[in-house]
A protein has these predicted regions:
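Short hydrophobic beta-strand element within catalytic cores of glycosyltransferases
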Residues: 371-374
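Conserved donor-binding/catalytic core segment of Leloir-type glycosyltransferases
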Residues: 272-290, 296-299
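Short alpha-helical donor nucleotide-sugar binding micro-motif in glycosyltransferases
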Residues: 341-346
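A short, well-ordered alpha-helix in the C-terminal region of glycosyltransferases
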Residues: 413-426, 435-438, 442
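Acidic anion/phosphate-binding donor-loop and adjacent secondary structure
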Residues: 236-239, 255-270, 319-321
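Conserved acidic donor-binding segment of nucleotide-sugar-dependent glycosyltransferases
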Residues: 386, 390-397, 406-411
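Aromatic "clamp/platform" in nucleotide-sugar-dependent glycosyltransferases that forms part
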Residues: 354
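Nucleotide-activated donor-binding/catalytic signature segment of Leloir-type glycosyltransferases, i.e.
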Residues: 317-337
Length: 446
């Protein structure tokens, strides 16, 4: 069942987990350390490679595993077609036609993660073929896999698993976040959900949250599972949920330090920023929970020598911006270097998010030497120290403006070195993803 070099497919790890001889266990760990024995790890996520932050994390983690001698596999929902040289290790779960049907069905029923039976049967057959030692799940909600079938399979096969919580969906009856709504029903039992029209959106005529909540509680209970959170905030919430008896460890997200670093750029000239003090923000699709109201109000409060630059607008959203030269909207950066240039040239990066886990944009700004101002919400504030920025009470517009001005008046040069050092020490992608490999080793040697 387990991946061994030279086709040595012996159930050594099963022996260890069953309480095998201590000397033999130490011998096997030695064999693993020097890659005489290898492990197979399967990641499962909604997206892969270019599919948002979790798709990129899945891709990057696969590469880190391969560099460390681990046989790495990925199964993902949609949004990418594996190349010919990837097809043995990268598996797309849904076709475009199945994706269209499952999106409609999921939005109609509200049972995110409880449809897609045919697609999941094919996935389980593929898992039977590759025989992973560990299954590492990321986002399993949405409309690409039947969570009930998947988790029951993992339980029946007694496969150790990891689940990285990129949001709160794992222990709620519907929502991915509840900070904005202020709902705490997830602590005792979901019903009459106030967030059915929020992500993951549903138009179900009957509230599905109670059924979803009870089903998740039942399915996760028998698993040999370790939860991972990118933030301490989410790990603390997990300990207040029905998952509280399952282990949870914090592994922060990371970014590529060779890509995100301070550079000289011509973005100020290209976008007409000039010598004005540049306040950078990522638009987040101008979603309310991502701070839309604060981003749209801020330009009216700025001085003539200050400008807000909003990057990541969707097509047509420029029309929503205030009619003033104190805001510049950018749909997408043309190249990765341009994005790095925007981070590097900014005097301050702001993230007025109202609910979030551990925003990668904060890490990218830090790595480029730019201080951060963010609301004290979710895990967003965890990256900020007195040397790297300021944290403001959630929803405090006056406090947000005051913090921006404090940093602008102090000068970015007072923050650059501390921001970069914190990024290098705490959020280096290679170091952070290496922690997953250590976690896999610890799980298999229990």
């Amino acid at each position: 069942m387990y991946g061994m070099k030279q086709d040595l497919h012996t159930n050594y790890w099963v022996y260890i987990r069953a309480g095998g001889n201590k000397v033999f266990e130490e011998f096997l760990i030695f064999m693993f350390k020097y890659q005489i024995i290898t492990m197979k790890v399967l990641q499962i996520n909604t997206r892969y490679y270019n599919g948002g932050s979790t798709g990129r994390i899945t891709f990057d983690l696969k590469k880190v595993m391969e560099a460390n001698g681990i046989e790495s596999y990925v199964a993902f929902g949609f949004g990418y077609n594996p190349k010919d040289n990837e097809k043995d290790t990268v598996y797309r779960i849904e076709s475009d036609r199945e994706l269209f049907i499952s999106k409609l069905w999921t939005k109609a029923t509200g049972h995110h993660g409880f449809n897609n039976k045919c697609e999941t049967r094919r996935l389980l057959a593929w898992i039977d073929e590759i025989k992973p030692d560990i299954i590492h799940m990321h986002n399993i909600h949405n409309h690409y896999v039947n969570v009930r079938m998947l988790l029951e399979y993992i339980s029946t096969k007694n496969i150790p698993c990891v689940l990285t919580m990129h949001d709160c969906w794992t222990f709620t009856g519907h929502c991915a976040y509840f900070d904005y709504s202020g709902c705490e029903k997830w602590k005792t039992g979901c019903n009459h959900c106030p967030s059915l029209r929020d992500y993951p959106k549903t138009f179900a005529p009957i509230d599905p949250s109670s059924w979803n909540y009870k089903m998740k509680k039942k399915l996760f209970a028998p698993l040999n599972i370790t939860f991972v959170s990118p933030s301490q905030w989410l790990c603390d919430l997990q300990k207040q949920s029905f998952l509280k008896d399952k282990p949870c460890v914090v592994i922060n997200n990371g970014v590529d330090m060779s890509v995100f670093h301070p550079i000289k750029s011509n973005v100020r000239e290209e976008y007409g920023i000039g010598n004005r003090k540049m306040i950078l923000a990522v638009a987040g699709g101008l979603a309310t929970r991502k701070g839309k109201d604060y981003l749209l109000k801020l330009p009216s409060l700025l001085n003539e020598d200050e400008v807000l630059v909003l990057v990541g607008l969707k097509k047509g959203q420029e029309a929503l911006l205030p009619t003033t030269n104190k805001v510049i909207g950018i749909q997408r950066s043309k190249t990765p270097d341009e994005l790095v240039g925007l981070y590097s040239e900014a005097d301050v990066f702001i993230n007025p998010t109202l609910e979030d886990n551990f925003p990668t944009t904060n890490l990218e700004a830090l790595a480029c030497g730019t201080p951060i101002v963010t609301f004290n919400t979710g895990g967003s504030a965890e990256v900020v120290t007195s040397e790297t920025g300021l944290v403001v009470d959630k929803g405090d517009m006056d406090g947000l403006l005051s913090a921006i001005r404090t940093i602008l008046n102090k000068g970015k040069e007072q923050y650059v070195d501390a921001c970069r050092k914190k990024a290098e020490s705490d959020y280096n992608k290679e170091i952070q993803y290496g922690k997953y490999i250590e976690l896999y080793k610890n799980i298999l040697s229990r």
